[in-house]
Amino acid sequence: MTTRQPLYKSLYFQVIVAIAIGILLGHFYPQTGVALKPLGDGFIKLIKMVIAPIIFCTVVSGIAGMQNMKSVGKTGGYALLYFEIVSTIALLIGLVVVNVVQPGNGMHIDVSTLDASKVAAYVTAGKDQSIVGFILNVIPNTIVGAFANGDILQVLMFSVIFGFALHRLGAYGKPVLDFIDRFAHVMFNIINMIMKLAPIGALGAMAFTIGAYGVGSLVQLGQLMICFYITCVLFVLVVLGAICRAHGFSVLKLIRYIREELLIVLGTSSSESALPRMLIKMERLGAKKSVVGLVIPTGYSFNLDGTSIYLTMAAVFIAQATDTHMDITHQITLLLVLLLSSKGAAGVTGSGFIVLAATLSAVGHLPVAGLALILGIDRFMSEARALTNLVGNAVATVVVAKWVKELDEDQLQAELASGGRAISDTREEDDLGVAEGPTPTTVK
């Protein structure tokens, strides 16, 4: 029987306290808060440092260790089908809510008075986005370049190819597979070490946000923010909740299970900061490694539900605020463009804003300068985006695993009922399966 550790040693508690201290520091000592920005940036860079090798190890060991290669294509197909359906629902919900509530109505903003220079960089980055360019960008110029740049989709593509090739070698490739599995244990131990710095990273990021923009900016354009936050909550509880119930588990229990990851995301405003831990948590929840390794990384580009809600709401809000008329044809066009452009968003802070700029440029009917209206509050809405994205990808992993019959449902229910062991609460060797040996297909 294990003794429960003191509350103050829990990462969950430490991150909550750090966020609270960050808010107070940013409010009462704004210059100090702004100066703490490197703490948040440094933490996210540490996480990004190990994301590429972790994805590589997880995907390769999962695919190479599978008996039936057809199941890989089946898993990928089901995952993309799920992503497309649910993200489309998210886009539609955002569109309906912003039309009903009309948060920008009555602002009567003159576009010519807006400072477009503030959003010029986002517009330039947005114009670089194209469907063909996005597809070609998935193919890395070099293997080293994919890992050096930390491009998740490029690393994922190479990992899938490498996993297939290693599987074809059979027993001859076993030493390589064993090495990759042991290397993965080292990477996850590094993650455990980095996560001890999560409270410091969350404190720095939150102190900077409040110090730079002020609590007052939380009130400015508050109707849009409140509308967006409520929509995200309803999406998680109603839409994702219904999906979870239909597949035999509770979304509230799942949220409780990933509470530490949600707090890390809340502090850093980046769902990417929780990616390595999500790989561990979802596998521990009963999903096979091969499913987790494909669904989670792919979902960070194709299943961003919170970002989808934000994109439709922000685009129509700009139209309402600038008195730009949007009839049903314009809104359908916007929706169709977003069905494509939203798939290019990554799970990092600010990517949603770049995709919004790309969308406004592509649609043409909406004033791109209107981006300046929401630039100040975009940082505060990124928390809701990132949290919704994370929950959406957790649900997707369980659902797809169940669809392809790669889910241990007894383990799922047991883990959800217990609330899940905190990764930082147990021995690292036990968490990462070191005691189990190098077998890549073992589900912990």
Swiss-Prot record:
One of its GO terms (molecular function) is malate:proton symporter activity. GO terms for biological process: L-aspartate transmembrane transport. The chain crosses the membrane at residues 7-29, 44-66, 79-101, 143-165, 186-208, 221-243, 291-313, 353-375. Keywords: Cell inner membrane, Cell membrane, Membrane, Symport, Transmembrane, Transmembrane helix, Transport. Its main location: membrane. It is found in: Cell inner membrane. InterPro entries: C4_dicarb_transport, Na-dicarboxylate_symporter, Na-dicarboxylate_symporter_CS, Na:dicarbo_symporter_sf. It comes from the Bacteria. One of its GO terms (cellular component) is plasma membrane. Residues 418-444 are annotated as: Disordered. It is a multi-pass membrane protein. Pfam families: SDF (PF00375). Belongs to the dicarboxylate/amino acid:cation symporter (DAACS) (TC 2.A.23) family. Responsible for the transport of dicarboxylates such as succinate, fumarate, and malate from the periplasm across the inner membrane. This is C4-dicarboxylate transport protein. The lineage of its organism: Bacteria, Pseudomonadati, Pseudomonadota, Gammaproteobacteria, Pseudomonadales. The gene is dctA.
